[in-house]
Design a protein with these regions (language model features):
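Hydrophobic core segments of alpha-helical transmembrane domains in multi-pass membrane transport
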Residues: 106-107, 147-156, 184-189, 228-236, ...
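Membrane-embedded helical hairpins/re-entrant loop segments and their flanking transmembrane helices
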Residues: 97, 123-169, 380-456
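Transmembrane helix-loop boundary segments of multi-pass membrane transporters
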Residues: 241-249, 444-462, 472-495, 506-517
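Non-transmembrane, juxtamembrane loop and terminal tail segments
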Residues: 72-85, 584-614
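Early transmembrane hairpin of solute transport permeases
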Residues: 87, 94, 98-308, 474, ...
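Re-entrant/interfacial helical elements at transmembrane boundaries that shape
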Residues: 117-125, 181-191, 396-403, 437-450, ...
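Flexible hinge motifs at transmembrane-helix junctions and intramembrane kinks/re-entrant loops
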Residues: 14, 21-71, 125, 130-141, ...
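Catalytic phosphate/metal-binding cores of nucleic-acid and nucleotide-processing enzymes, i.e., regions
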Residues: 82, 100, 377
Length: 614
């Protein structure tokens, strides 16, 4: 027997679970969007006890018919790959217990590196970091993990605002994490606060500048982000037509490309040894070696040992991508980091003393920061949340695509509205919870595409893991003890992946002359600023009026931050440049079609042919 079509007026339970792999069939898209209990039509609802009994006492409930071999077997290079024959599990489908655990762990490992990296970098050492003590940094990492898990639950379950047509959350397997977009604006803001004397410094006799801890600067970042998060909330209520006009693919691709490219500088500096005082390679003092002279097996900045450590992470990641199984490929960055940690421990560079003295558990608000709003940071952080809105829309589009949900029409627009609203609220709630702003992550979409499991049950398991890791502070201490070269080797791969996502989005364009002009103009200024950060530093005058000077500092920060300039130029040019009557084929008539509408390629991981449509 087979079940009726989802569009049918009646719904029946399939007699063969191995054939349909459903616990229930749902009748309409509207029913699917409800929270789990309401997603089950009354005619097939079973008692809670019978569902629990079936889930935990049968092979179907524990194991199911998923192709675990395809998930775990390594893929040899240059050998034809067999497509994953596992069933596809949609967002609202129940999945076996073991599969939920495996998928939850896989999604967790795919995002953990991206979640902790911004917090590690902004709390670290240097002129554009907070230079905080180990205990405070441990707490900040714990808070970022806890908040990421909590806000992931909001995105996954999708709640309707009572008596309205609006939602909070996308209702998809979307894990949230600390956005990389926070990093450039936060670093610029902290750097300005050190320059202006808001944050303390100490100058040695030889002229070496030591940047002292500045926890109040983090409070200013949190307060400023909370105010600016209302921009994303406002965008979530805009008509879909306006959102599509403001944030087309060309804007999204340019911004992501510039974010990833500009962050590579920080990643490479950490690969060489860190961003602290040792970076200037002083010949005297406490920082001739990195991170300091008294660190275990300290090395000079840019030395061969640091280079080799970072390379061990980077190239292990590439080797796993070459020969690893689907599971290992999805967690390749974490495996590379673990290999690097083993090598660092073997040569005596891994200091575990901070792990020993760290408390067993922590919670939000164990440490607090004085909230304030930093005037010169408002304009840059408005663009941070504008970019987060762009990121969110791109991630939700990809999530719907890999989850078997249409990426156009009322259903998608409702999910986009709910996802944007949840991200905006996350900016406020994460600030109150002492964490940088979180946004939907794109890594999960890749995991869904190759595992064919988009069930929200797996997402809930991932969120629970994030919350647990945030509570157990020994884990945060272990993450903090990782030497800077290993963080650098991992982060350059993550940052380049962000840039690659932007390139992929741009490849969908038709590349008309108009497109090329917008991209060229945006990248000219944005990448130029990334290469020469002081390009605009001395343009604005210095005045005694504090308020006016704050305004000038805000302009300098905006013009000195590459991805903000990319966003401004791409949005403005996209709105004012006229569309062409015909695509410009004069320069490219004989060239093969490398991207844009009509491009067809084969996705080897998914085992299917995909056509890119305009």
């Amino acid at each position: 027997m087979t079940s009726q079509s989802p569009s049918s007026s009646n719904t029946s339970v399939p007699s063969s679970m191995s054939k349909k792999h459903y616990d229930i069939d749902v009748r309409t898209e509207q029913i699917q969007d409800m929270v789990y209990p309401q997603a089950i039509p009354p005619i097939v609802q079973k008692s809670l006890g019978s569902r629990i009994k079936r889930k935990f006492t049968t092979r179907e409930g524990w194991i199911g018919d998923y192709d675990y071999r395809a998930l775990c077997m390594p893929r040899l290079p240059f050998v034809t790959k067999k497509a994953n024959s596992s069933p596809f599990y949609g967002p609202n489908e129940d999945i076996p217990v073991f599969l939920a655990i495996i998928m939850g762990i896989q999604h967790f490992l795919a995002v953990i590196g991206g979640i902790i990296t911004p917090t590690l970098l902004i709390s670290g050492t240097g002129s554009n970091a907070l230079n905080l003590d180990e205990q405070t940094r441990q707490y900040m990492i714990s808070a970022s993990l806890f908040v990421s898990g909590l806000m992931s639950i909001v995105q996954i379950i999708r709640l309707r605002i009572p008596k309205t047509r609006y939602f909070i959350g996308a209702g998809l397997l979307q894990i949230t994490g600390v956005s990389f977009a926070n990093l450039p604006a936060s670093q610029a803001m902290v750097q300005n606060m050190y320059k202006s004397g808001v944050c303390p410094t100490e100058v040695a006799a030889d002229g070496t500048v030591t940047y002292l801890p500045c926890p109040d600067a983090f409070g200013s970042i949190l307060g400023t982000q909370m105010i600016c998060a209302f921009l994303t909330i406002a965008i979530s209520f805009l008509p879909p037509r306006i959102i599509r006009r403001l944030f087309p693919k060309i804007v999204t691709g340019i911004v992501l490309l510039v974010i990833g490219s500009s962050l590579l500088t920080t990643g490479m500096e950490n690969w060489a040894g860190g961003t602290g005082p040792c970076m200037s390679r002083p010949t005297t003092g406490d920082y001739m070696l990195c991170p300091s002279n008294d660190a275990p097996n300290a090395q000079p900045w840019g030395g061969p040992v640091n280079f080799a450590l970072g390379a061990s992470v980077f190239f292990t990641t590439l080797v796993i991508e070459l020969v690893g199984s689907v599971f290992l490929k999805n967690v390749s960055v974490v495996i590379g980091l673990l290999v690097g940690c083993v090598i660092a421990a073997g040569i005596g560079m891994f200091d575990g003393s901070s792990i020993a003295i760290a408390p067993a558990a922590t919670f939000l608000w164990v440490k607090t920061f004085k909230l304030s709003v930093y005037g010169p940071g408002i304009i840059p952080f408005l663009f941070v949340y504008l970019d987060m809105s762009i990121e969110c829309l791109g991630d939700l589009t990809a999530a719907c695509d890999v989850s078997g949900i249409p990426i156009e029409g009322p259903s998608f627009e409702e999910r986009a509205q709910g996802g944007l609203l949840a991200d905006g609220l996350s900016g406020i709630l994460s600030g109150l919870a002492t964490s940088l702003g979180v946004v939907t992550f794109s890594q999960n979409n890749g995991v869904i595409a190759v595992t064919r499991c988009a069930s929200r049950v797996a997402g809930m398991f991932t969120a629970a893991l994030l919350i647990l890791f945030g509570i157990f502070s020994k884990i945060s201490a272990a993450l903090l003890a990782i030497p800077s070269p290993l963080i650098g080797g991992m982060s350059v791969f993550l940052f380049a992946s962000v840039a690659t996502s932007g390139i992929r989005i741009l490849s969908y364009l038709e590349w008309t002359r108009r497109d090329r002009v917008i991209i060229a103009a945006s990248l000219a200024i944005a990448l130029g600023v990334a290469v020469v950060p002081d390009w605009f530093t001395y343009v604005m005058p210095t005045v005694e009026n504090t308020a006016l000077q704050g305004f000038y500092d805000a302009i300098s920060t905006v013009c000195g931050t590459g991805y903000i300039m990319a966003g401004i130029l791409s949005i403005v040019l996209n709105l004012i440049l006229p569309y062409e009557a015909k695509p410009d084929h004069q320069d490219d008539a004989a060239a093969p079609q490398l991207g844009g509408a009509g491009r067809v390629y084969r996705d080897e991981e998914a085992g299917q042919v995909i056509e890119v449509r305009n």
